[in-house]
Structures are given as C-alpha cells and as structure tokens.
C-alpha cells in the first residue's frame, strides 16, 4: 500500500514523502496514529495544494517582513528622557519604551521581545543602533536617538 507521510517517521521518511509499506503497518500503525494517509490521487492533490498555499503564504510574509525591515532602517527614533544633575539619564531606555514610541510616532507594531539591547546599552544620551529580529532570519537595524530634557 502507498501512504503519504503527514509527519516525519524515524525509520521510514519525512513528511510529504510517498512510501510503499505493508498493508498492516500502513493501516494499523501509520494511519492509525495519524502519521500518514492512504496515498490516493485526491489526498496527494490536496496535500500538494496545501503545500503550495503554505509556500505562497510564506513568500507573502517574508515580503512583508522585508518591507518592515526597510521602513525600520530609515527611521531614527527619538526618545526623550529626564536627565539627572550630572547630565546622566535616570535609568535607561527599555525595549518597551522603544516599541511604544515606534507605535506612537510611526504606527509600526513591533514585539518588544524582538528588540535586542545590550545590558549596558542606552544608558546615556546619544545615537544608538538597535537590532530588531523580525523573524525568518530577517533583522533590521533601528537608530535610536536618546535625548535629555
């Protein structure tokens, strides 16, 4: 019997492969545990259509992330913080503040977990480069200008 693997099976193959197996193994184990489906022409056609749809969605998502990367790379985000008597900042600029300012000033929503700041970063007035990990191995460099008020 021919089966279409839905999930990776250690001794048999990877998801998406069509394999010839014994009837009992195919029906009782693979199909029974949801690891495979009987490889009928309809099942194969549906699987290929679903794979094509996933690829198109992935391309669309990556193109949107590339656009966001380009937008973020052009922005210099200005964040004003209160200065102490000696001219240093009270505290530091946090990921949350960067994400909130991006949304407020530029209407761009970025998850605060995607923003990477070093421990000793953004604790003084100045211009900084901050990495924003967008997903699918795409990251952008955002310029953050910390100013005192």
Swiss-Prot record:
Stretches assigned to coiled coil: none
Name by which UniProt lists this protein: Large ribosomal subunit protein bL9
Biological source species: Campylobacter curvus (strain 525.92)
Top-level taxon: Bacteria
InterPro entries registered for this protein in UniProt: Ribosomal_bL9, Ribosomal_bL9/RNase_H1_N, Ribosomal_bL9_bac/chp, Ribosomal_bL9_C, Ribosomal_bL9_C_sf, Ribosomal_bL9_N, Ribosomal_bL9_N_sf
Family named by the database record: Belongs to the bacterial ribosomal protein bL9 family.
Keyword Ion transport attached: no
GO biological process: translation
Record-linked PANTHER family: 50S RIBOSOMAL PROTEIN L9
Pfam family, one: Ribosomal_L9_N
The keyword Hydrolase appears for this protein: no
Gene Ontology molecular functions: rRNA binding; structural constituent of ribosome
Gene Ontology cellular-component annotations: ribonucleoprotein complex; ribosome
Function (record text): Binds to the 23S rRNA.
SUPFAM superfamilies attached to this UniProt entry: L9 N-domain-like, Ribosomal protein L9 C-domain
Record keywords, A-Z: Ribonucleoprotein, Ribosomal protein, RNA-binding, rRNA-binding
